[in-house]
Amino acid sequence: MTLSIRPDTVSAAQMVSSLSTQQTPTVTEAEMVQAVRTLLIGLGENPDREGLLDTPKRVVKALQFLTKGYNESLDELLNGAVFTEDANEMVLIRDIDIFSSCEHHILPIIGRAHVAYIPNGKVIGLSKIARVCEMYARRLQVQERLTLQIADALQGLLKPQGVAVVIEATHMCMVMRGVQKPGSWTVTSAMRGVFAEDARTREEFMNLVRHNANFH
């Protein structure tokens, strides 16, 4: 297994800007279906043959599902599931399955996220952490930005002592095409608050999540 370590290369300001770039679709679903038909023809296929008759509609529906995070918001997602609590020790959810799509080739990114925070008077429903990961993953992404968005969303929502996010993923654009390197994994991290400032806290988190990735 090869691990490709990518540092946090996107600033918080760039991350916030990226959250506000969603635009209202300017084409209809019928136009999207026609575009897929055109792609099939361009590939030398016949979209009117039996096996492909409904493929354009299916592709559009699949892409809409895979990018449904654009139509979700943190407020709707949380639904008030933030609670006052005196807890001040690390809360960690490990091995959250991540399915995203790379924005360069629209091919799958498959991996797992490890998310921790140290409360500062507020805690969040555990399932909501997974849902935050899901919301940002269901968009066209790069792994670096996905990692930062999850960390900064939780930091903004809870104002905790700190947030830590690590994502380990394999990118089909490196496996199925291009360099064709199955078995390579990309690891990204984002540390906020005490996780960035205190080496011992960061090391405790890394020790808890350190394990061999196994997504077979």
From Swiss-Prot:
GO MF, any single term: GTP binding
Pathway assigned in UniProt: Cofactor biosynthesis; 7,8-dihydroneopterin triphosphate biosynthesis; 7,8-dihydroneopterin triphosphate from GTP: step 1/1
Record keyword tRNA-binding present: no
Nucleus keyword on record: no
Chain ranges passing through the membrane: none
Enzyme class: hydrolase
InterPro entries: GTP-CH-I_C/QueF, GTP-CH-I_N, GTP_CycHdrlase_I, GTP_CycHdrlase_I_CS, GTP_CycHdrlase_I_dom
One family name in Pfam for this protein: GTP_cyclohydroI
GO biological process: one-carbon metabolic process; tetrahydrobiopterin biosynthetic process; tetrahydrofolate biosynthetic process
Catalytic reactions on record: GTP + H2O = 7,8-dihydroneopterin 3'-triphosphate + formate + H(+)
Keyword entries, A-Z: GTP-binding, Hydrolase, Nucleotide-binding, One-carbon metabolism
GO CC annotations, alphabetized: cytoplasm
EC numbers, comma separated: 3.5.4.16
Subunit structure: Homomer.
Recorded family membership: Belongs to the GTP cyclohydrolase I family.
UniProt name for this protein: GTP cyclohydrolase 1 2
Encoding gene (name): folE2
